[in-house]
Structure formats: C-alpha cells, structure tokens
C-alpha cells in the first residue's frame, strides 16, 4: 500500500511517538482496522473480478483469525517499542464477538493498534510492514 509522507487525511504533519501513545489503544485500533481493510482492498482489486468476489475475498482476508496469524508472522520483525504498542492493543481489546476466541481477538486488536500507531507517526515503517504481509483470498 502506498502510504504518502504527506497525507491529506492526516495533514502534513506526523505525530510524535509520544503524542501517538497518548491516544487510546481502541482509537488506534479503529484507525488500524480501516487502514488494513483499505490495504487489502487495494491489493485484491487486480486482476479485475466481480465486485461480489472482491468483497468476499476482502472479508476473508480481514477476519480477526487471519489478522492474528499475520501478527504472529510479524513479531520477529518488530522493535521493542512496536511490541509494546501491540501489547497495549491486546490488553485493551474489548468485548469478544461470539464466533471468536479471546486470544484471536486480542491479537487482531494488537495488530490493528500497531497499524494505526505507525500510520500516525511512522508511515515508512507502516509501508515496510504492510509489504511483509501476504494478502491472500481466504
């Protein structure tokens, strides 16, 4: 996913890591969830398919179970600071949907929190990590 240095949605400024850490983990996860779904939609758009097929592929790829798997694959690449952001996100995970185990939901929330945090304060690192994640039709 192309993450521009200057983003009209974020403004022309990045937050400092200290400022981004002041945001609630749930807020960062909310942002990270939207970013990851957008990333998957961009990656699955081509080759051209019917919109229903693209939608089904995206839904499968952004499920919490899949995000939990992706987080596990990223863990060796994360810095101590990033691992702390993931931990904060996991610990802040709210009510778990019935179809999920708490562990999957917490891990998915941890990944989303990290993505939201990096979007706000380190877009190059966000892009580097997103490139490490395989986007497959699930």
Swiss-Prot record:
Family matches, as SUPFAM superfamilies: RNase III domain-like (SSF69065)
Protein EC? 3.1.26.-
A Pfam family recorded for this sequence: Ribonuclease_3
Compartment(s) of residence = Cytoplasm
Question: Which prosthetic group or cofactor does it need?
Answer: Mg(2+)
- GO terms under cellular component: cytoplasm
Residue positions of the active site: 33
| GO biological process: one example | rRNA processing
A GO term, aspect molecular function: ribonuclease III activity
Query: Which Gene3D superfamilies did the record assign?
Result: Ribonuclease III domain (1.10.1520.10)
- This protein's UniProt keywords: Cytoplasm, Endonuclease, Hydrolase, Magnesium, Nuclease, Ribosome biogenesis, RNA-binding, rRNA processing, rRNA-binding
Function, as annotated, reads: Involved in correct processing of both the 5' and 3' ends of 23S rRNA precursor. Processes 30S rRNA precursor transcript even in absence of ribonuclease 3 (Rnc); Rnc processes 30S rRNA into smaller rRNA precursors.
Question: What quaternary structure, including any partners, is listed in this protein's UniProt entry?
Answer: Homodimer.
What family does this belong to?
Belongs to the MrnC RNase family.
Question: In its UniProt entry, what is this protein called?
Answer: Mini-ribonuclease 3
